[in-house]
Each structure stands twice: as C-alpha cells, then as structure tokens.
Amino acid sequence: AESYERIVLWFEHDIYDQAVLIRLLDHFEQHPELHDRLYMITLDRFPGIARFNGLGQLSPDQLATLWGSERPVTPAQRQLGVAAWRAFRSGNPTGLGTMSERNDLALPYLAAALRRHLQDLPWTRDGLSLTQRLTLQAISEGAPTPGKCFGALVNQLEPQPFLGDLMYWPIVAELARASEPAITPVVTWQSPVALTPLGKRLLDGTADWLTQNGINRHHGGLQLAMPGAVWRWDGVTGSLLRA
C-alpha cells in the first residue's frame, strides 16, 4: 500500500463486506503515514436495480460510474473500525448489540450489518439462526433442491444477502446431518430436499434446534457451546439474551 498515491476501499453494505472493512480500518489506524491516502466507495443501492445485493451485480460500465464518488476515510471512521473490530472478535456480543442499535455511526451501513450478524445467532423461539430458518422456509414454500434454496434466499427471502454458495453449503449440510435433522439428506446442490418432522415443528415454533442437537461453533469471536448458557437473539425484542 505504501507505493500507491491513493488507496480506495470498495465495499458493499452487507456483513461480509462490513466485517472486512472494519478489519482493514483497524489495520490502517496503526499506520498514520497512510491516513491521508485512504478513500472509500460504499453503497447499498444502485439506480435501476430493484434488489441490490452487491457490486458483483454491476456491469463494467456501471462500476465505472462509481469512480469519482470516493470520499476520504475520516478519523471517526477509522476509530469506529478499531472499536467494531474489537467487538466483533470479542467473546461477548453485547458491544455489537449496542452498535447495531445506533443510527449515527460514522460507517452508515455498519449498524444494520451487525444486526444481521447477530440474527444468525440461535433465536430464542426455536434455536435456529435466521439463515437456517429461511432455508426451512424456502423448502416449505417449494424449493426442491439446496441450489433452489440458495437462489430463494439471495433473490427473495434474505433481508441482507451476504453468503456465497461455499459459505451457505455447510449450513444446509448441518441441517441434514445433525443427530436430529431438519431436512432430508443432501449430497449435491441438485439433491431433492424436504423437511423432516422436526423441520416442520421448528417452522411451527414447537421445537428447539439446540435442545435436539446442541451447538458447538464460533460466530465471530463468540464461541457457542453446550452444555451451558448460549447467547441467543430475541426476534421479538430485537435484543440479545444468554440462556
């Protein structure tokens, strides 16, 4: 980076991009010699595109129209990046919860992205992450294969698309391979898929995924493991709960 006159950061609004952005801002904060060379292009919509999922939707000509809209990265944005990256790596998600509730952050899309990140914690109603529940919903609404589920999430159901197919597949596989699966076995993107009796009860809100299968995974810097209390997302109050 030291050899360039300007460094322009191009980032979308989703949690995948925003997480990379705060990591970079944390890094650049430690390099004051680069501060006056940092610029940013960031967006959550584009004229003529009804459902903007990201820069990958844009043609070369459309991308070219964004050049010139870059703005200098401010000290407040760098400092927010440092604080947000620290919170993202923390084993306690309450700092992220606080940031996700603010509407005055120096990075305009960060709060919504962090909220979407927290929504992929297990929910209090059924122990599912939002991505897991939307997958079951897609199947219940007629998606016949994992590939069609992914398409339904990206194009319709997901409020803030951020998962690529390689990131999404392990989520589908877990739903199928758990001790008490929520969907029928899948091997490829084209495998026929259907809800199991547990999957139907999960969608009805009469079963809990963690009660049936437990959990042991990381979500950012937070380790979710049972036995013991696990951080969950309360979809009614829009807040975190440890239970």
Give the ranges of each region predicted by the language model:
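A short acidic (Asp/Glu
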Residues: 17-25, 49-54, 162
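Short, conserved secondary-structure transition motifs
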Residues: 40-65
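Short amphipathic alpha-helical elements of helix-turn-helix/winged-helix folds
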Residues: 134-142, 152, 171
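Short acidic, hydrophobic short linear motifs in intrinsically disordered regions
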Residues: 142-154, 164
